[in-house]
């Protein structure tokens, strides 16, 4: 572990990490302090230059024409639905196996979530989507669970057939791809979270919406800042969901210096686990597909004695959740 520890770490000293087992995601904090100090000295706290740079960096990372920074991943979902005029009387197809924010955003927008079951890889079963479509359906919201992309070719094809929007909950998949293409190419928008739990994390909350559609991006830039076109003119009613400049500085540092290594290590760790666990007949892992680049925000296994194994792992200082 010593290669992953910050320079401030002393032997036998416990480094408290609430949200991640990867110490590297929370290392280099003395260097990040310097980036934050630059922001403080400029007093540029709201939609500052670091935010502009962060949006450019994130757009490049995700292959998108436009990246709109927002306050958190939940707002990213909600604001996208609002910008697409999805609300009361509308239905949005998604999955029940997800964090509450996915469904919460749909309900808060005034729409009704319609659930489609997941497959063995924990992602939406694309072959069951069409049966869930009604006259009220306005969008499909696939959730790329645990860092594994959904089968977007089929989902996007269905969406185009029925003229539906596609809003991808991409909170777990920064750096992932589908058939060597960026996920933003399969729908209206992808939404991301930079919560401390995520592969790309800031020191608090942060989120992003990426899209290739200029009209959608322009509306989102307005909605995330009260609908203000400038200081005195409001074009639409919006929200206060700006990514603050300090968090943008943290994100910029991590995109430049940390994210690639974090992704590589997660893939390497998962590959090792796949290899070692394949010899254990009591453990079932997710089948890997060549056309999917996974980034392993989580690593899933299935066992019969789930609770017993969880207790054993935790007792041996290996975090495990159900």
Identify the residue ranges that each predicted region occupies.
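Conserved active-site segment immediately N-terminal to the catalytic lysine
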Residues: 168-203, 230-235
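Conserved PLP-binding active-site segment in aminotransferase class I/II-type PLP enzymes
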Residues: 1-83, 87, 108, 160, ...
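Short beta-strand-to-turn element immediately C-terminal to the catalytic PLP-Schiff-base lysine
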Residues: 192-193, 207-212, 252
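PLP-dependent aminotransferase-like
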Residues: 4, 82-170, 177
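PLP-dependent aminotransferase class I/II
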Residues: 3-4, 22-23, 51-56, 64-67, ...
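Conserved SAM-binding loop
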Residues: 69, 94, 115, 209, ...
